[in-house]
């Protein structure tokens, strides 16, 4: 053994060839600060070996290196800029020394090589991979850019276009694509990986392969003519501006850095990467996006822990076909859980099956499945007008009309047709679960399971615990949602649960702005372009359905009369009374016509201004700041109340529910992350300006308390230790 660290070791393999093996104590290898320091020590040992002829890097895990340790990021981002810059210089000196070894080097890459893992293998001369490879640089998705030389080496290896596509989009690619673009030199079966890598090294040692020529381009300026450079970088900047926009500075910074570094050799190019990385790491966007990653891990870990002792349902059923029922049935069948889909009429069943078939055909068009797989999946959805097969199902989700009487009747009837241990769930969006449970003999086997539309796209499923729902019931439904590829978040019961309960105060803020003379077009523009929502409130209401929102608003007002009962006729009432239900009937805040792809395209409709004039004061202008404040304060206040009332368990779960269920702008990180970034005292000052607008604008006492003590909602993060300690960590 030449060297043994906590996460890697170095040993002789054969005849002058050494192997450096990543072997962390846990289930995966991460390139954390300690591993970078250990890698530097191992390379120091290699540099002393006079009889070294070649080096093979490999992993003892199912994946090579999954990336940097993102749990360290938030504390690293708090390190002063100069210290962070110094640490990056140290880390890059380690990879440079790996790249500069006076012998050929090869990485035998299995499974994932992402982020720092990818940057590590870019420093070797050759890369041999297994068919299960996923390799790439996802840093821009975390609000940063590659910091271990990825933005320098990858363009010089692949050419500007392929590298920009991966780096700017934060993409990873599979083995075939990696081989095609030159990111790896070969793909072999897992059992032949090490032997294959040794064979390549022997060829390089014997002079059959010119490893020095392979290495040289990575040390030099990027080989691009002026015209090629202009085209590549202009196109990349245009694409990034279109897709990422101003709220996500990392992708455009990465492109500009690669462009600026193109004319320099490795050292100067790495300096430019360093100068770009450090300011990005100190942005609110980076903290928010890293926070989302960590919250996502937390939420998924919680679901895994909850379901460790239960069996995932093997057979499911959906009550109520149509678009929603068909979407749920498709998602279940697509992920391997056969489903019975019941309705009371043929027309709805046909609609449900058509929806499932349409979604499967999209997978076929994208090349994700072949005709055989499509036929196989669709055959596991069984449409029925009766309860045939219900004695075999483990879980049933009801997705009938949003009417408590109808839902109670359907659930009570179904309870008589299933096994005593079968779990029933309701896909209601607003009706309290405990109210529906009154109709059942076994309320402990019942809970809420709120999907979001369109089911195949929206990641969130709210699992609602009723007063009598058992832990096992919740666990089974969480297991099914996870199996469907969804992110289940368990919430406690109340009208609207979590997501709709906090959405309707936001709509109330919108209605009040319109009442006071604001233009809905400007509100939408501000909330989309400035705050960052994917849709403004008017457009969102058109998509959700004005009739759906009108009904849900009444349910919420009955549930929370003190705050959500309104004493005036609003824009939603006016449009509803005029039979303008949004996209579903082509008339809402806008008029809708289908484009060439069959998608609804919005157009101005002057009639709307006349309708809104009946429920509004004369038009006047509002500043962007006032629009954002008046829209967001009611929502954030309600989010805080939900935490204080234990409707939702943690700030992390609340923020993920908002992002995955409503499209809350990820660069803000969620409502609690936004609050922490703004500061609770500053938020309180802002909210107090609008208290006269009513109870929705009154800040909850718990938040006032946070402001008094200057406390954040997320646990404070300590800066990482000084750079000298990081080196030797």
Curated annotation (Swiss-Prot):
The keyword NAD applies. Residues 1-189 are annotated as: Enoyl-CoA hydratase/isomerase. GO terms for molecular function: 3-hydroxybutyryl-CoA epimerase activity; delta(3)-delta(2)-enoyl-CoA isomerase activity; enoyl-CoA hydratase activity; long-chain-3-hydroxyacyl-CoA dehydrogenase activity; NAD+ binding. It catalyses: a (3S)-3-hydroxyacyl-CoA + NAD(+) = a 3-oxoacyl-CoA + NADH + H(+); a (3S)-3-hydroxyacyl-CoA = a (2E)-enoyl-CoA + H2O; a 4-saturated-(3S)-3-hydroxyacyl-CoA = a (3E)-enoyl-CoA + H2O; (3S)-3-hydroxybutanoyl-CoA = (3R)-3-hydroxybutanoyl-CoA. The active site is at 450 (for 3-hydroxyacyl-coa dehydrogenase activity). NAD(+) binds at residues 324, 343, 400-402, 407, 429, 453. InterPro entries: 3-OHacyl-CoA_DH_CS, 3-OHacyl-CoA_DH_NAD-bd, 3HC_DH_C, 6-PGluconate_DH-like_C_sf, ClpP/crotonase-like_dom_sf, Enoyl-CoA_hyd/isom_CS, Enoyl-CoA_hydra/iso, FA_oxidation_alpha_subunit. The keyword Repressor does not apply. It comes from the Bacteria. Involved in the aerobic and anaerobic degradation of long-chain fatty acids via beta-oxidation cycle. Catalyzes the formation of 3-oxoacyl-CoA from enoyl-CoA via L-3-hydroxyacyl-CoA. It can also use D-3-hydroxyacyl-CoA and cis-3-enoyl-CoA as substrate. Heterotetramer of two alpha chains (FadB) and two beta chains (FadA). NCBIfam families: FadB (TIGR02437), PRK11730.1 (NF008727). This is Fatty acid oxidation complex subunit alpha. It comes from Escherichia coli O139:H28 (strain E24377A / ETEC).
